Regions:
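Predominantly a Rossmann-like dinucleotide-binding segment in NAD(P)-dependent oxidoreductases
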Residues: 35, 155-196
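N-terminal Rossmann-like dinucleotide-binding module
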Residues: 5-76
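Short, Asp-centered acidic motifs that coordinate Mg2+ and/or phosphate
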Residues: 57, 98, 178
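Rossmann-fold dehydrogenase core element
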Residues: 137-154, 174-179
Length: 196
């Protein structure tokens, strides 16, 4: 992992990058959702509780899925007649400020790169990407765009992780030479899927 981080730092000089944005607080943040599967439910629930956010668009590769998703979640007036993320992001009438990318793992990089290239901030579901090369490309796109790329990686806030961190930092275990951990998820990593 250290080698990967060093490669990324060397190629991107990320530590010296400063991102500043001015946001007009007199209007709502206009947000779109790319990928309307099960993880998008968590995103829409959060957005619905934010008074300064307006959900304006959504798309999914499965025709009709985005419209059904927003209807099921009680959100009206959302434009969903897009066949792809590119079509949605190319619609300048939306005036998107940000998108949540809730696609399959293998489909994270392309929409993130395209959104950033269109000047749209990105909230990207974990995992960031599935390869180092994709990660580097997404980070280059962020740097070139001056927009914000945020990775939704919340396990660090999990009470179990916090407890482990506290124990390790306390020194109670002495000097740690090796740790092995594992995890899983119900659905696994869905592959292969077509490039988008």
């Amino acid at each position: 992992i250290t080698n990967m981080a060093e490669k990324m730092d060397a190629k991107l000089d990320y530590a010296n990058q400063k991102v500043e944005q001015v946001i007009d607080t007199n209007r709502k943040l206009r947000v779109g959702i790319i990928g309307c599967g099960w993880i998008a439910d968590a995103h829409i629930d959060s957005y619905k509780r934010m008074p300064d956010v307006e959900l304006v668009a959504g798309c999914d590769l499965i025709p009709g899925k985005a419209a059904a998703f927003f209807k099921r979640n009680g959100v009206e007036g959302v434009k969903t007649d897009y066949a792809s993320h590119k079509e949605m992001l190319d619609d300048e009438s939306l005036q998107l400020d940000a998108v949540s990318i809730c696609t399959y793992n293998r489909q994270h990089a392309a929409p993130a790169i395209y959104a950033l290239s269109k000047g749209v901030n990105v909230l990207l579901e974990k995992p960031f990407t599935v390869t180092l090369d994709e990660a580097l490309e997404v980070m280059k796109a962020e740097k070139a765009s001056g927009k914000v790329l945020s990775i939704g990686f919340q396990p660090r806030l999990d009470p179990n992780m916090q407890m482990i961190k506290k124990i390790v930092e306390s020194g109670e275990l002495g000097k740690i030479y090796y740790i092995q951990t594992g995890g899983g998820r119900r659905r696994g990593i869905p592959t292969p899927f077509p490039e988008v």
